């Protein structure tokens, strides 16, 4: 009973930390994200063989990089993504068959591509491979399809990506999880990139309906013309 209680408390603490991360990400609170990332990094250093601890650190760094990217701070993206990659690589090394660990690794690889041209091509391929493996391991992962869609959004069609592929990925993510505000957010961005502004606004509005606290979604809706 005592072991069960300890396990339950550890899981609950993990959920609480994830919730704190999401709230800080939603309000673009980089100071809070930096603190949470530091705490997660300290925890993983004390548990080198705990894949979940490394994963939690990777997620924290990825959220920090995400907000830095939203605010166009390339230096901060690099500073967050690099340690995040190390954490995610360690999680994958310990448990290579966990799809979510592969997904967050692929996401972090993708986040660093725009800020480091020298390694961009190499990391871009690593990102694609890692996310493809995540989908292979868990074909019903909505998050993995969002991650693949983000990659396709940024990669030109001539290099195997493109906005049309991205839209299909985001639509698949929504099919798998109709309550994914992240999928609707990125669907809106892809629709706007395709000059389909009315559909973009509809997707942004749905994303905000699901998650009213996401500052970046509000910003994207405000800057999208009605037609």
What are these model-derived regions, one by one?
Residues 51, 99-100, 142-143, 181-182, ...:
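Helix-start (N-cap) detector for alpha-helical repeat units in TPR-like alpha-solenoids
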Residues 64-71, 112-119, 148, 152-159:
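Glycine-centered coil turns and helix-coil junctions that link the paired helices
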Residues 164, 181-227:
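Terminal, low-structured helical/coil segments at or just beyond the last alpha-helical repeat
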Residues 10, 14-71:
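N-terminal leader/linker segments that initiate helical-solenoid repeat arrays
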Residues 30-35, 71-86, 118-133, 159-172, ...:
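Structural signature of tandem alpha-helical TPR/SEL1-like repeats
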């Amino acid at each position: 009973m005592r072991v069960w209680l300890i396990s339950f408390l550890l899981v609950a603490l993990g959920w609480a930390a994830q919730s704190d991360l999401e709230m800080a990400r939603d309000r673009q609170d980089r100071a809070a994200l930096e603190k949470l990332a530091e705490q997660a990094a300290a925890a993983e250093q004390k548990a080198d063989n705990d894949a979940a601890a490394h994963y939690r650190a990777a997620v924290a760094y990825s959220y920090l990089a995400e907000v830095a990217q939203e605010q166009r701070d390339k230096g901060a993206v690099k500073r967050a993504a690099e340690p995040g990659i190390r954490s995610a690589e360690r999680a994958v090394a310990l448990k290579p068959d966990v799809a979510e660990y592969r997904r967050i690794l692929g996401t972090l690889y993708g986040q660093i591509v725009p800020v480091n041209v020298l390694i961009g091509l190499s990391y871009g391929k690593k990102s694609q491979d890692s996310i493809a493996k995540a989908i292979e391991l868990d074909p019903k992962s909505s998050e993995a399809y969002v991650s693949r869609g983000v990659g396709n959004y940024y990669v030109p069609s001539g290099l195997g990506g493109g906005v049309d592929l991205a839209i299909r990925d985001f639509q698949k993510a929504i099919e798998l999880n109709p309550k994914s505000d992240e999928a609707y957010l990125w669907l809106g961005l892809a629709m706007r990139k395709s000059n389909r502004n009315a559909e973009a606004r509809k997707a942004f509005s749905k994303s905000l309906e699901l998650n009213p606290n996401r500052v970046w979604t509000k910003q994207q809706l405000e800057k999208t013309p009605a037609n």
